[in-house]
Amino acid sequence: MYLNQVFVSKALALQLKNALMALGCPTENRVLILSPKDQDIIQGGIIIPGQAKDELPNKGVVILQGHLDEEYKWYTDLIETGRILTYGMYAGKEIEFNPDIFRKEGISLDLDKNKFTVLSVNEIIYSEVNNN
């Protein structure tokens, strides 16, 4: 089942990275991603009922990476800023930022439609190139 999702571009991911780096970054083997909140329509326009959505993995765009331990260095290319990650439904922890941070940098981002999540690289199921 493929969701009809729209992800932020790699260029916007890099802008977000620059804006957020002044505030800090994920610790150790973690990554900050930005995901669309509403993931209820599959390709073809079929609406997915609430219970069925619980079984689907989440996807999001990498914004920031923490410092990888030696044993996780091989993840480096898989979690570079702008890549799209697939991760489990219950993986990660949502985190909120003040929208003014982005406005000051001239970044237009609708936080009602997007969410930030920090997850461990162990929770990543799949990594793909972002063609946006």
Language-model features: locations:
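Compact, glycine-rich, soluble single-domain proteins
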Residues: 2-132
